[in-house]
Amino acid sequence: MAERRKYGKKYCKYTEMKVDFIDYKNTELLKLSMSERGKIMPRRLTGNSKNAQEMVEKAIKRARHMALVPYIVDTKNITDSAYARSFY
């Protein structure tokens, strides 16, 4: 039987930074909980607390509605990373 991997304990970044409210205008803070394609990452991957995850989801949805953050990112047009260049 294969050994199980041991992962480090996940912690809430927002609780550690003592953030009381996550503002939709602070896009740098929102990018901590978004994937490179612009999707909202789930709690099991980010380690956010329930309260922080709900605030993040609301803030990202508001920022998308106000066009501060894109709904989706087209990775075909981005050739900055070495990973993207290796396939073309």
Curated annotation (Swiss-Prot):
The family this protein is said to belong to: Belongs to the bacterial ribosomal protein bS18 family.
Function of the molecule: Binds as a heterodimer with protein bS6 to the central domain of the 16S rRNA, where it helps stabilize the platform of the 30S subunit.
One of the record's GO molecular function terms: structural constituent of ribosome
A Pfam family annotated for this UniProt entry: Ribosomal_S18
Quaternary structure and interacting proteins, as annotated: Part of the 30S ribosomal subunit. Forms a tight heterodimer with protein bS6.
NCBIfam families: S18 (TIGR00165)
GO biological process, one term: translation
Name this polypeptide is given: Small ribosomal subunit protein bS18
Residue intervals passing through the bilayer: none
Swiss-Prot/TrEMBL keywords: Ribonucleoprotein, Ribosomal protein, RNA-binding, rRNA-binding
GO cellular component: cytosolic small ribosomal subunit
InterPro entries, per database record: Ribosomal_bS18, Ribosomal_bS18_CS, Ribosomal_bS18_sf
